[in-house]
Amino acid sequence: MTSSNGWWGNKFGAQFGLKCYKAFSVENLFLQAEFNAVRPYTYSHDELNLNFGHNNQPLAHLWGANFREAVGIMNYTKNRWFANAKVVIGKKGFDFADGTDTKSYGGDVFADNDDRVSDYGNTIGQGNVANVFIGDLQLGYLVNPATNLKLFGGLTYRKFEPAAPAKGFSASNSTWISFGLKTDVFNWYFDF
């Protein structure tokens, strides 16, 4: 780990974050900032049933391995009004899907470690590099506090830019406008 030679077996990830309640002395303002990075091949294994995945999903992080991401979250409430915002900016290394390069670049936890691209010189984001941006904004009104019934509207923007088409993915931009009525009748999560 300390030689910095990019050995494929140096499998680790890092997470740094900060949560702030009553940020800037503003009542009911919650801020969160987070940085995550995971080296290539971290959750994969040469015995496929020993990887860090289940039900065709990576367990440790949605992006698997071979990525860096920064996350910012803001929640604010004033009386019965609320606003939530979330921004995710990241870079992820995928395998190539053109059929000419069948090596694993370390991002797919279900790929065999023995198919790695190199023993040394592996870096986060190697392979088919994709830039990812996700922005989400939601505004709403708490209609009934007893049942947590909320009227809300939201805007979500996602941008995915791989250098080349990835397995099942190509470059895309999507924007969603949402609105609705929701309730958290069975919200029993109070670990904060």
Model-derived regions: residue spans:
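Exposed, low-structure sequence patches enriched in small/polar residues
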Residues: 1-192
